[in-house]
Amino acid sequence: MNLINEKLNNLENSATKSPKEAVVLLNMGGPNSLYEVGVFLKNMFDDPFILTIKNNFMRKMVGKMIVNSRIEKSKKIYEKLGGKSPLTPITFALTERLNELDPSRFYTYAMRYTPPYASMVLQDLALKEIESLVFFSMYPQYSSTTTLSSFNDAFNALKSLETFRPKVRVIERFYADKKLNEIILNTILSALNNCKSQDFVLIFSVHGLPKSIVDAGDTYQQECEHHVSLLKELMQQKNIPFKEVLLSYQSKLGPMKWLEPSTEELIEKHRKSNIIIYPLAFTIDNSETLYELDMQYRLMAERLAVKEYLVCPCLNDSIEFAKFIIELVKNLKSE
């Protein structure tokens, strides 16, 4: 009887004990309303990792010009998505699932360009008396424009809290993990819905970058290419053939030379084939996946008379992705 009571007490204590480690999922964010579209664009184009103009005054001036030229077009895009970005609510749903699956840690999220900002989230974690943190980049491949920008923002926010000094570890890339790539491959097969893979051209579409950023040493292009090669190897191992497997870059902005080929170019080039697109650089659906790939490019594919045009969803708040995140955190070595 004493043993039963002891076990019940242990269960009760573990249920009420607050986690001392927090995992903060870092992403770019997106407008939570049409009003926030301006906030989102202003913060993005004021980011020195995005607009790499060293002079602060000049960067703000150029950024303001870009925002003014894009704000109305961007609002129309988000109107088509229900008046807001899906990224924040999906990320919230993912953290809810993570906290349910792994109550030993507290999972939350911080956004780079829209609330909740890292400063807000870290203040909350300080009140929770968190002793250790994992900053988890939601970008599978590393780039100064995304990963480094988010980490820089999070660490600056942490430094501003003088009395909050938790142990910090980071997960800055995870594209090479075989378990992730098996989830991606299963997502692609599910989107095919029993169609034969060999009848499709598979395009891995990633967010584009100005070539000048890569020339300055950013490893993003190299990591995207490596990611595609790993997925090709996995397809070969599992005997899942496609007509072709290609990498493309989307979301070009401005007159500068960007990474090529563009997603639009490849859709046009393979217009006589069935096409399936997987958004390889995104883990959570956003305007670039749901509007650009699934609406804008779908219309283009229809004009080109592409017979089958399929777009895979991102990993989002799927239980497979949640379990992958938990395992990655558990296996993270102490620094």
UniProtKB/Swiss-Prot annotation:
Family membership: Belongs to the ferrochelatase family.
SUPFAM superfamilies attached to this UniProt entry: Chelatase
Record-linked Gene3D superfamilies: 3.40.50.1400
Molecular functions per Gene Ontology: ferrochelatase activity; metal ion binding
Annotated PROSITE patterns: FERROCHELATASE
Pathway membership, UniProt: Porphyrin-containing compound metabolism; protoheme biosynthesis; protoheme from protoporphyrin-IX: step 1/1
Entry-linked InterPro entries: Ferrochelatase, Ferrochelatase_AS, Ferrochelatase_C, Ferrochelatase_N
Name under which the protein is recorded: Ferrochelatase
Main subcellular localisation: cytoplasm
Enzyme Commission number(s): 4.98.1.1
Residues the entry annotates as binding Fe cation: 207, 288
Keywords (A to Z) from UniProt: Cytoplasm, Heme biosynthesis, Iron, Lyase, Metal-binding, Porphyrin biosynthesis
Function as written in the Swiss-Prot or TrEMBL entry: Catalyzes the ferrous insertion into protoporphyrin IX.
GO biological-process terms attached to the record: heme biosynthetic process
Swiss-Prot/TrEMBL catalytic activity: heme b + 2 H(+) = protoporphyrin IX + Fe(2+)
Entry-linked CDD domains: Ferrochelatase_C (cd00419), Ferrochelatase_N (cd03411)
Superkingdom to which the source organism belongs: Bacteria
Compartments it resides in: Cytoplasm
HAMAP family on file: Ferrochelatase (MF_00323)
CC terms in the record's Gene Ontology section: cytoplasm
UniProt keyword Lyase present: yes
